[in-house]
C-alpha cells in the first residue's frame, strides 16, 4: 500500500502528537450519548404510533409480505446437498464416524457387554462402583467416595445398569475428544488474533443455538445411533472448553512466563510446562463444563436414536409412566451430581508432594488398593453372579409405590392445578399470545431499533435490528412471537421468584451458601428432567411447558442476585450504617443499585436458559419454533432446522447484546469498571 509523500513527510504539531483521534462529522453526531438517547426515544415513540395506527397501516408494515420471504432453508438444503454429494463430504464424515464408532464399540463392550471388539466380558458393576468410590476418595474424601460408589450401587439395584452404561459409554468417548479439540482450538485462539476473530462469532452463535439445531446436520451426514449421539455431543460440548482455555491462558501472570524465558525454555516448553499448568484451574473448569454439557446432550440425543437413559425416559414420558420416569430421572440426577462434584473436586485439587525417599507404595497407596479391589471383585463376580450383573427380575423397583404416592398426591392437588391451569390458559396465556401475534412487524422492528439505539448507539441498533429483521425475512415471524411470549412470561415469573429469593438469601451468609448449593445442584440436572414434574402436575399443554421453563430459569436469577449483593463493597455498607440508614434503606439505596449490573447478567442468563428450555418443552405440546424444529428433525430437513435454530439464536443474541451494553454502561456509571 503506497503512502502519499506529502502526507508521509508532513510535520506533526507537538500539541497533537500522541493524541487520540476521535470521530468527527456524522459518526460523532450519531455516537453522541444525548443525541443517541433522543433518537432512541423518537424510534420508541414511532413504534408506539405504529401499534396505535395498525388498522390504517399498509399490509407490508403489519406482516412481512410472503412474496418477499427469503428462502433461506432451500438455499441451505442446496448447499448441504452440494457439500454432501458433489464434494463427497458424506464419505469423509462417514469415515470419521467409523473411527468414533470403533471407540464406542470398545467402551460398549467393556461397560455393558456389547458383542464387539475386543469381545471381552463386561466389567462387573461392583468393580465400577468401587472405581468410582476410590476416585471420589482420592479427590475429596469419604463424602465423594460415598457419592461415587453409591450412585452406581443405586443404578445396579434399580436394574438400570445397561441403560446407564449405554449412556456412559458415549460420555467416556465424547468427553476426552471434546476436551482435546477445545484445548487445541483455545490455544490456537490465544496464539492468533485472526483465529480468535474467526472463532468468536461462531462460538457466540453456537452457544445460542438450541440443542436440536445441532442434531439435524449430524443425522444427514452421519446417520442415527450412538455414533451420531457421540458426534453431536462433541460439537455441543466444545465451545465452553475453548472459552475457558482462552481465558486461562490470558490470565497467566507475565512474571511467570518471564521466569520460564530466563531458564531458556522454548515457546513449546513455555506452553507445555508454564502456561498450561498455570491455567490449570480455568482449563479444568472447562472440563467440568464439557462433562455436564455432554450428559445433557447425550440424554437429549435419544431423539436421534441414541440408546440409554434418555431414550428410556423419552419412552416412559410418552406413555405417561410417572413412577418409572421418576426412577430414571433420579438416576440421571445422581449421575449429573456425581460427575459435577468429581470434576469440580479435580479442578480444585492441588498436586500432592512427598518428601524425598518416600516409597512408591506410600505415594500410590490408593492406586494399589484400587487394583486389588478390581482383581478381587472380578474374581468374586465369577462365583457370585449378582456382583457382575443384577437382572431386571432381581432388581428393586419403587415405581409402583411411587405411582401410588403420585396418584394420592394428584388426587389432592388436581383441583388446585386444574384451577391454575384453566386460569392461566384462559385469562393470561391466550390473551398474551394473541397480543404478541397482533403486534405489527414494523412496530417490533422499530421498537428494537429504538431501545438498542438508546442503549448502545447506532451500531447496536443496526446489530439488533439485523438480528430481528432476519427472523422476519425467514418467514417464521409468528412462531418466533409465540416463542417470545412464552419466554417473556417465564422470565417474568422466574424474576418475580428468583430476585426476592436471592435478596432474602443474601442477608445471611449461611442461608446464602445453602441456597447456592441448591442452585449448583439444580444446575447439574439435564434440562429434560424438568419435564417430569410439570407433566405430572399440569399435563401436556403450554402451562406445563412454561412451568418447566420457569423452574429451569430460576437458578441463574437467584444465583446472580446473591452474588451481586454479596459483591457490594463493604466500605459502602459501612458508610450507610454510619449515616444511620436502616437495613431496608441500605438494601434499596445502596446494595441493590450496586448489584444491578450483576443482577442483569442473571437476567440475561435467565433469558438464554429459558430459550433453550422452551425449545425442549416443545416435546410436551407447544406451537412455537421448538415444535417446528422437532418436525424438521423428524424429516431431517437440514435447512429448515438450521434456520429455526438461527431464529432462536438471534432472539437470544439480541437480548444478550441489549442487556450487555446496558449493564456495561451501568457498571461504568457506578465506577465498577473504567
Enumerate the predicted regions with their spans.
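C-terminal transmembrane helix and the adjacent membrane-cytosol boundary/short C-terminal tail
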Residues: 250, 281, 285, 326-384, ...
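Individual transmembrane alpha-helix segments
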Residues: 88-135, 419-451
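Short cytoplasmic-facing helical segments at TM-TM junctions of multi-pass membrane proteins
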Residues: 241-287, 557-605, 629
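Glycine-rich helix-loop "coupling/hinge" segments at transmembrane-helix boundaries
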Residues: 220, 249, 292-335, 351, ...
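Transmembrane alpha-helices
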Residues: 175, 231, 235, 267-300, ...
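Interfacial/capping segments of alpha-helical transmembrane domains
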Residues: 54-102, 384-424
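Transmembrane-helix boundary motif in ABC transporter permease subunits
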Residues: 132-139, 148-165, 174-203, 448-458, ...
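Generic hydrophobic transmembrane alpha-helix motif, especially the helices
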Residues: 170-173, 177-184, 190, 203-237, ...
Amino acid at each position: 500500500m503506497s503512502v502519499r509523500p506529502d502526507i508521509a513527510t508532513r510535520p506533526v504539531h507537538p500539541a497533537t502528537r500522541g493524541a487520540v483521534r476521535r470521530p468527527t462529522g456524522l459518526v460523532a453526531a450519531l455516537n453522541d450519548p444525548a443525541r443517541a438517547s433522543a433518537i432512541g426515544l423518537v424510534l420508541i415513540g414511532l413504534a408506539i404510533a405504529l401499534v396505535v395506527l395498525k388498522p390504517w397501516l399498509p399490509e407490508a408494515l403489519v406482516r412481512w409480505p410472503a412474496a418477499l420471504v427469503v428462502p433461506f432453508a432451500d438455499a441451505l438444503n442446496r448447499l448441504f446437498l452440494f457439500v454432501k454429494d458433489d464434494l463427497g463430504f458424506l464419505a469423509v464424515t462417514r469415515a470419521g464416524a467409523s473411527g468414533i464408532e470403533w471407540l464406542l464399540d470398545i467402551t460398549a463392550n467393556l461397560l455393558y457387554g456389547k458383542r464387539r471388539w475386543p469381545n471381552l466380558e463386561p466389567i462387573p458393576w461392583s468393580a465400577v462402583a468401587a472405581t468410582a468410590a476410590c476416585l471420589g476418595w482420592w479427590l475429596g474424601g469419604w463424602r465423594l467416595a460415598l457419592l461415587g460408589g453409591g450412585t452406581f450401587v443405586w443404578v445396579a439395584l434399580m436394574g438400570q445398569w445397561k441403560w446407564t452404561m449405554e449412556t456412559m459409554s458415549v460420555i467416556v468417548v465424547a468427553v476426552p475428544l471434546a476436551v482435546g479439540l477445545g484445548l487445541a482450538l483455545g490455544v490456537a485462539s490465544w496464539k492468533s488474533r485472526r483465529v480468535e476473530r474467526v472463532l468468536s462469532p461462531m462460538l457466540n452463535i453456537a452457544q445460542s443455538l438450541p440443542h436440536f439445531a445441532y442434531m439435524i446436520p449430524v443425522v444427514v451426514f452421519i446417520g442415527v445411533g450412538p455414533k451420531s449421539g457421540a458426534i453431536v455431543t462433541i460439537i455441543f460440548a466444545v465451545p465452553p472448553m475453548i472459552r475457558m482455555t482462552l481465558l486461562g491462558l490470558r490470565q497467566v501472570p507475565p512474571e511467570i512466563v518471564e521466569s520460564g524465558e530466563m531458564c531458556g525454555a522454548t515457546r513449546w516448553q513455555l506452553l507445555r510446562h508454564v502456561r498450561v499448568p498455570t491455567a490449570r484451574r480455568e482449563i479444568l473448569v472447562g472440563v467440568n463444563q464439557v462433562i455436564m454439557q455432554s450428559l445433557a446432550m447425550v440424554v437429549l440425543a435419544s431423539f436421534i436414536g441414541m440408546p440409554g437413559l434418555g431414550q428410556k425416559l423419552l419412552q416412559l414420558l410418552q406413555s405417561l409412566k410417572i413412577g418409572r420416569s421418576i426412577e430414571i430421572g433420579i438416576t440421571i440426577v445422581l449421575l449429573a451430581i456425581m460427575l459435577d462434584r468429581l470434576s469440580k473436586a479435580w479442578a480444585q485439587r492441588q498436586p500432592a508432594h512427598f518428601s524425598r525417599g518416600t516409597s512408591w507404595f506410600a505415594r500410590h497407596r490408593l492406586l494399589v488398593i484400587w487394583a486389588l479391589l478390581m482383581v478381587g471383585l472380578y474374581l468374586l463376580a465369577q462365583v457370585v453372579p449378582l456382583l457382575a450383573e443384577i437382572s431386571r427380575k432381581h432388581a428393586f423397583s419403587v415405581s409402583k409405590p411411587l405411582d401410588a404416592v403420585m396418584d394420592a398426591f394428584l388426587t389432592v392437588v388436581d383441583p388446585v392445578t386444574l384451577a391454575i391451569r384453566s386460569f392461566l390458559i384462559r385469562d393470561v396465556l391466550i390473551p398474551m399470545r394473541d397480543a404478541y401475534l397482533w403486534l405489527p412487524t414494523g412496530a417490533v422492528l422499530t421498537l428494537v431499533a429504538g431501545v438498542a439505539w438508546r442503549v448502545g448507539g447506532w451500531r447496536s441498533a443496526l446489530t439488533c435490528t439485523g438480528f430481528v429483521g432476519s427472523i422476519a425475512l425467514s418467514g417464521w415471524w409468528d412462531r418466533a412471537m409465540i416463542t417470545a411470549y412464552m419466554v417473556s412470561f417465564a422470565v417474568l415469573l422466574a424474576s418475580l421468584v428468583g430476585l426476592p429469593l436471592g435478596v432474602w438469601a443474601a442477608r445471611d451468609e449461611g442461608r446464602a451458601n445453602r441456597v447456592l448449593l441448591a442452585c449448583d445442584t439444580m444446575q447439574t440436572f439435564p434440562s429434560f428432567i424438568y419435564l417430569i414434574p410439570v407433566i405430572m402436575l399440569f399435563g401436556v399443554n403450554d402451562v406445563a411447558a412454561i412451568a418447566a421453563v420457569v423452574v429451569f430459569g430460576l437458578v441463574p436469577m437467584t444465583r446472580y442476585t446473591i452474588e451481586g449483593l454479596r459483591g457490594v463493597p463493604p466500605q459502602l455498607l459501612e458508610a450507610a450504617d454510619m449515616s444511620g440508614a436502616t437495613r431496608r434503606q441500605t438494601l434499596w439505596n445502596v446494595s441493590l443499585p450496586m448489584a444491578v449490573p450483576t443482577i442483569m447478567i442473571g437476567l440475561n442468563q435467565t433469558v438464554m436458559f429459558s430459550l433453550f428450555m422452551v425449545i425442549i418443552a416443545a416435546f410436551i405440546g407447544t406451537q412455537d419454533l421448538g415444535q417446528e424444529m422437532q418436525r424438521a428433525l423428524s424429516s431431517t430437513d437440514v435447512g429448515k432446522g438450521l434456520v429455526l435454530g438461527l431464529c432462536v439464536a438471534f432472539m437470544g443474541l439480541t437480548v444478550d447484546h441489549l442487556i450487555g451494553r446496558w449493564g456495561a454502561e451501568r457498571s461504568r456509571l457506578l465506577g465498577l469498571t473504567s
